[in-house]
Amino acid sequence: MATINSKIPAGPLKEKWTNYKDHQKLVNPANKRRLDIIVVGTGLAGASAAASFGEMGFNVLNFCIQDSPRRAHSIAAQGGINAAKNYQNDGDSVYRLFYDTIKGGDYRAREANVYRLAEVSNAIIDQCVAQGVPFAREYGGLLDNRSFGGAQVSRTFYARGQTGQQLLLGAYSALSRQVGLGKVKLYTRYEMLDVVLIDSRARGILARNLVTGKIERFAAHAVVIATGGYGNAFFLSTNAMASNGSAAWQCYKKGAFFANPCMAQIHPTCIPVHGDYQSKLTLMSESLRNDGRIWVPKDIEDAGRLQRGEIKGKDIPEEKRDYYLERRYPAFGNLVPRDVASRAAKERCDAGYGVNNTGLAVFLDFGDAIKRLGRDVVEQKYGNLFQMYEKIADENPYETPMMIYPAIHYTMGGLWVDYELMTTIPGLFAIGEANFSDHGANRLGASALMQGLADGYFVIPYTMQNYLADQIQVPRFSTDRPEFEAAEKELQDRITRIMNVKGNKSVDDLHKELGHIMWDNVGMGRDKAGLEKAIVKLDELKKEFWSNVYVPGEANDLNVELEKALRLADFIEIGTLMAHDAMDREESCGGHFRIEHQTEEGEAKRDDENFAYVSCWEYQGEDKDPVMYKEELVYEETVRAQRNYKS
C-alpha cells in the first residue's frame, strides 16, 4: 500500500523554509556539471526553473510545445502578481498573504507550502525588477499596486493588463542567456508523451517532434514537469488551444499520484460564449473588478427586454440596478474570491436575470469609475483590456457596460507533490499549475504568476539539489536501454491505434461532446445524479473515441489532428477522474460546489470533520478504478471557519 509523506520540516511555521535551506544537501560546482535535468515546459515556472538550473551549473534540456517560449500560455495573464511588500502601508504582511491564500482556498491547502509561497513572494518582485520587468509605477516612481479578489489590501503588482507577458519576457531573457552559454539546450515544437522510469526513478522522457512526427528519447538524472493545467478538458476555457494535461497524465499512469482533480476554477469575468463554432473563451482581467461594478436588472421584465435586444444596459436607470455582489458581500463587494463571484453570477442568470440573448451574462460597468476618475485615468489603467473587449464584442465599454460570464480558467488540482515539489515517483518533480500544492480549493487572483515564479526561481533550485546530492555517482543513462525501448513501443502502438481507427467523427466534434458533459455535470454546480451521469457518458465517449475518431494525415509527419487526438484521449480520462473525485468529496469547498451541501444562503458548506484532506489518486491500470489515498491537512496557525466575505 502506498504511503503519503509530505516531508514537511519540523519546527514553527515561520522557520520551516529557513531550516530546510540551512540543512539541505548541496551539490558542489564540479559535480553540477555532471548532472542533467529535463524541464518540460517553458512558461513562467518552466522557463524560470530551466534558467535557474543553468545559472547554477547543471546541464538542462528544456522542452517547449510552441515555436518559442514567448508563446507559452503564461503570456495571457493580465492583471498582476501578488507579493507582501506592503508598499501601500495598508496593513499587508507575509502572514496576511499566507492567511488570505489559506482562507481563499477554503482551508484545503497545506499551511507549510502556502507560508513558503508568501515568504518568497517579495523576492520575486526584486528579481523581476532586476530583470527589467516594467511594473507600473506611481507618480513619484515607486512600484504601484492594486487589489484583487479575496484581499482587503493592495498587494498586486502589475504591468497594465499585460503582466504575464512582461514577466514571461523577463524569464525568457534569463533562459536565453543560459541557452547562449550552452548550459540549457532548448527543444522547440516538442511535446512530451511519456516519462521513462529506470529502477522506479524518473530518468527520461519520450517526446514527439511536432514538425517531423518522430518520437525521440531523452535521458537525465531528474525530470521537472511544468506543463500547466488541464482546463481544456472542458473544451471551452480561457486556456490556450495547445494547453493540455497529457504530460502530467502520463506521469500519473506511470505511478505519480494525482491530487484533488475535481478542484477546477471558474473565473467570473470572461467574455460570454457567442456561438457554436467558438473554440476558446477570452478572460477579462480580475483587475477590472477594482473599478468596475457588477450588476443585473432588479426587474425581471428589464432582463427580458435586454435578452430580446430591445434595450441596452445604459438604458436602465441606477435605481433599477442590482449590484448583487455589493449587496450580498458588503465587506468585499466586487472583490470577493472568484468562486464566490462566479456562483453569484450563475445564480442570478439561472433566476432569469441574465442580460444577453442567451441569458448567460451579467454587466461589468465602468460608468461610476469614469465619472469619479475621468475617462483618461480609466483608459490609462485598463485601456488595452477595453480595446480587446471592443474587438471581440463589438461594443465600446466606455459607453456601454461590458457583458461577462464565468468560464473555466485554472485547475488547482494536479500532480501530488511533497514539500520539495517531488511527486511520488523519485526524481520526478512538478511545478507551477502542473502541481496541486498551494491553492487548495480555490486560487486567489494574481497568485498563479506568484506560484510559477516562486517554484522556478526560489524553491526548486534548493530542493533539486537536495535530491541530486545523492545522484552524483550515477552515470548518464543511455537511451538504448530496454526501459526506453519498451516505453517507445507502447507509445508507438498507441499512436498507430489512433491512426488506424479511421472513423467518422473529427477530434473537435468529440472534444465538444466532452466539453458539454463536463460543463453540464462537473462545472459550477455538481450533484450526485449529474456526476453519475457524467461518469456513464464519459465511458461512452471514451469507447466512441477509440472506435469512431478520424485522424487524417500520417503519424510520421507534421499532424495537428494527431496532436489533438492524443490530448483528447487523455482529457477524457482526466474528466472521468475529476468526476470520481467530485463524487467522493461530499462537501462544498472553493471551486468544488456540491449542490447538496450549501448553506441556507446558497454558500459553500464545508465538512471539515470528514473531508479536511488532499485526495491522492493512484492509477491501477486500464479500465480499473483508481485507488484514493488521503493526505490529512493539519492546521496549526489558522483556525478553520466557514468563509465570510460579508463583514
Features from the language model and the residues they span:
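Conserved N-terminal glycine-rich FAD pyrophosphate-binding loop of Rossmann-like flavoproteins
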Residues: 67-99, 265-269, 276-280
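An anion/pyrophosphate-binding glycine-rich loop and adjacent beta-alpha core
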Residues: 250, 256-391, 462-465
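Conserved redox-cofactor binding core of oxidoreductases
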Residues: 124-214, 226, 270-283, 289
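Short hydrophobic core segments
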Residues: 38-40, 218-227
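Glycine- and aromatic-enriched mobile tails/lids
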Residues: 24-27, 31-36, 49-52, 56-58, ...
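Glycine-rich loop(s) and the adjacent beta-strand/alpha-helix scaffold that form part
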Residues: 222-281, 439-462
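Extreme N-terminal leader/targeting segments of oxidoreductases
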Residues: 1-37, 643
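Short beta-strand "acidic-cap" motif of Rossmann-like dinucleotide-binding folds
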Residues: 59-64, 259-260
